[in-house]
């Protein structure tokens, strides 16, 4: 019987999901994106060649694997077409293998204009968005005024909806945000020019996924960002605009929750965050261990190029993530970045409002007030890069992994020891 796996980030994103999704596509016939947009990147290293993707599922790099963009994704048509062209240039054929949900909300220039203008207006209180229009596009979806992929294929309907939306959003841009408005005719013409390329890929993704599964296909649901950026469960308001947790694999693609059989939580061996928001175990990245993590871990955003904030591993944060996702097993990534550190620290809980708590709180205010409680463990001098078995890891590295398993209560089923596909230790295969 076919089996479906959901891959989610358990921290604030950038956990190394792209490589693991690519590795797992060896055992899947379809890969599905179910939330987010072109605001989150995933980097694959295959045979030493690096490929960065933002919208198209990582499975596209595996010949014969079908890829799906579900209704939970907000779609920038120019960006998905640019990604297709970039892949075509390295010999990867996309259009015949990619299906885009007709219910995807479309990101248009006024969404980007609103996103950028709002961040400028917030000043020091900015959220740290990528400025790509993701949030405003989700707002339109919830307000029931989104232009969806199916609308774009109907020129008359699209033109009417676009005019109505621009009347509304241009009023806000001009009168509240005091910035330039967006031109109707140019927006209309540019969008319609992309329709001939887009149209063959648009369809009923929900039915396609059901048909594939019933025909025996294993499906892999690829989450973007991280669970603590979830709009409901993250450090609100310092969150993204979508649900990043595993449950959204169902609503964001059109399959029932009973079709989600295994939840793989991708967990970095230390903690990082991009942009604003609380981060209890954060370290300064201009010195000491923080600098080591940032430098050795190459901690710069795939999409924005922004330097990531770095800190010690936070087991209390991971407990929250395991809880909200129903994680079956974890994949531990970037263990090799810790090589050479004499002492490691694990955050096991916090002092918060005069009490000791052992799980990350809900919302930014309490999270910002947390004082981390640390447990120290000895590090290791030996290299872990490229290790293929658990026994090949240094004893102290194995002890570090064991301790995290005990603190969180979920097994570590996979360990990534480098960026390439082959640099992976499998203790329990998610698809088996």
From Swiss-Prot:
Matching entries from NCBIfam families are given as: PRK01117.1, purA
Task: Could you list this entry's UniProt keywords, alphabetically sorted.
Answer: Cytoplasm, GTP-binding, Ligase, Magnesium, Metal-binding, Nucleotide-binding, Purine biosynthesis
What HAMAP family does the database record attribute to this sequence?
Adenylosucc_synth
Name of this chain's protein: Adenylosuccinate synthetase
The UniProt entry annotates the active site at 14 (proton acceptor), 42 (proton donor)
Instruction: Summarize subunit and interaction data from the UniProt record for this chain.
Output: Homodimer.
Gene3D superfamilies registered for this protein in UniProt:
Adenylosuccinate Synthetase, subunit A, domain 1, Adenylosuccinate Synthetase, subunit A, domain 2, Adenylosuccinate Synthetase, subunit A, domain 3
């Amino acid at each position: 019987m076919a089996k479906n796996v959901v891959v989610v980030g358990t921290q604030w994103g950038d956990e190394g999901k792209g490589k693991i999704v690519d590795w797992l596509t060896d055992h899947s016939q379809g890969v599905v994106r179910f939330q987010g947009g072109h605001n989150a990147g995933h980097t694959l290293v295959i045979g030493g060649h690096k490929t960065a993707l933002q919208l198209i599922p990582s499975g596209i790099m595996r010949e014969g694997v079908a890829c799906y963009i579900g209704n939970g994704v907000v779609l920038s048509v120019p960006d998905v077409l640019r990604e297709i062209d970039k892949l075509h240039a390295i010999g990867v054929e996309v259009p015949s293998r990619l299906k885009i949900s007709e219910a995807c909300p479309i990101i248009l220039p006024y969404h980007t204009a609103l996103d950028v203008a709002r961040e400028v207006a917030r000043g020091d209180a900015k959220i740290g968005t990528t400025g790509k229009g993701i949030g405003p596009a989700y707002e339109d979806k919830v307000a029931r005024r989104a232009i969806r992929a199916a609308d774009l294929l109907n020129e008359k309907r699209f033109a009417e909806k676009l005019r109505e939306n621009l009347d509304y959003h241009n009023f806000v841009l001009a009168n509240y945000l005091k910035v330039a408005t967006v031109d109707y005719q140019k927006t209309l013409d540019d969008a319609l020019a992309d329709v001939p390329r887009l149209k063959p890929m648009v369809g009923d993704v929900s039915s396609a996924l059901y048909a594939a599964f019933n025909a025996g296909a294993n499906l892999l649901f690829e989450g973007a960002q991280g669970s603590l950026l979830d709009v409901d469960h993250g450090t609100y308001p310092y969150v993204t605009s979508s649900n990043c947790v595993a449950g959204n694999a169902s609503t964001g693609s059109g399959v029932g929750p009973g079709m989600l059989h295994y939840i793989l939580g991708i967990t970095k061996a230390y903690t990082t965050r991009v942009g604003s928001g609380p981060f209890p175990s954060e370290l300064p990245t201009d010195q000491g261990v923080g600098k080591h993590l940032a430098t050795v871990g190459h901690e710069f955003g795939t999409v924005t190029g922004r330097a990531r904030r770095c800190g010690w591993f936070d087991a209390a944060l991971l407990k929250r993530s395991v809880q909200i996702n129903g994680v079956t097993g974890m994949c531990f990534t970037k263990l090799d970045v810790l090589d050479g550190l004499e002492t490691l620290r694990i955050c096991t809980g916090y002092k918060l409002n005069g009490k000791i708590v052992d799980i990350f709180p809900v919302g930014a205010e309490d999270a910002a007030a947390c004082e981390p409680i640390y447990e120290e463990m000895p590090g290791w001098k030996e290299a872990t890069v490229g290790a293929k078995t658990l026994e090949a890891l240094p004893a102290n590295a194995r002890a570090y992994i064991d301790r995290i398993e005990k603190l969180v209560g979920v097994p570590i089923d996979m360990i990534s020891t480098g960026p390439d596909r082959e640099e992976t230790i499998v203790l329990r295969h998610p698809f088996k």
